[in-house]
UniProtKB/Swiss-Prot annotation:
Subcellular location: Cytoplasm
This protein's name: Proteasome subunit beta 1
Subunit-structure text: The 20S proteasome core is composed of 14 alpha and 14 beta subunits that assemble into four stacked heptameric rings, resulting in a barrel-shaped structure. The two inner rings, each composed of seven catalytic beta subunits, are sandwiched by two outer rings, each composed of seven alpha subunits. The catalytic chamber with the active sites is on the inside of the barrel. Has a gated structure, the ends of the cylinder being occluded by the N-termini of the alpha-subunits. Is capped at one or both ends by the proteasome regulatory ATPase, PAN.
Regulation acting on activity, per entry: The formation of the proteasomal ATPase PAN-20S proteasome complex, via the docking of the C-termini of PAN into the intersubunit pockets in the alpha-rings, triggers opening of the gate for substrate entry. Interconversion between the open-gate and close-gate conformations leads to a dynamic regulation of the 20S proteasome proteolysis activity.
Active site positions, chain numbering: T2 (nucleophile)
Reaction(s) catalysed by this chain's protein: Cleavage of peptide bonds with very broad specificity
Example of a GO MF term: threonine-type endopeptidase activity
Function as written in the Swiss-Prot or TrEMBL entry: Component of the proteasome core, a large protease complex with broad specificity involved in protein degradation.
Organism of derivation: Pyrobaculum arsenaticum (strain DSM 13514 / JCM 11321 / PZ6)
Amino acid sequence: MTTTVGIVVKDGVVLATDKRVTAGYYIAHKKGEKLWKIDDHVAATMSGGVADLQNILSFLTVRAREYKTQFRRPIPIRALVNYMSLILFYSRPYVYVVHSIIGGVDEEEGAVMYMVDWLGTVTKEKYVATGSGSPYAKGVLEVGYRGDLTVEEAVDLAINAIKAAIRNDPGSGEGIDVVTITKRDGFKRIFTTQQKLLIPEI
């Protein structure tokens, strides 16, 4: 149970998550890290089985480094997504209980984001939410998303989407992590005034 959000804008991608880690109805951790830096130009969110996703995203991180060493350039994001999809597809009948948003900026597609589900299904998205709080977050995204959003506006929208989930979903809570991936700055963690004030408000 969790909430993760991704938004694509012209200049980059914004990813955001809550920080609550649950085991059934038990709050197992209050400072969970659900954002994973794969390389300077790409990151992923984690929703579902933490151990499964940590294992798979470790594979992706190593693959990205191997590609950069071999070809002297960052790995295309679609290649990473395809690699994850193959891992999930060929793991059957064992199923990894995972859901991930992978997004960033590359030379082939510019700012781009994909969602990968536990069966290996891949969908290209402009905005998306996963996890138990996704119905609440998705509603905020549906109302607030525009094609001409700036990165800063997308950060605010992502925070508001996670905020709605925290207010309504018992599986989400404790705080918000936000990262941006842009061509100019690469991977960057965001700490905004709204983010810092979020917990007292709730």
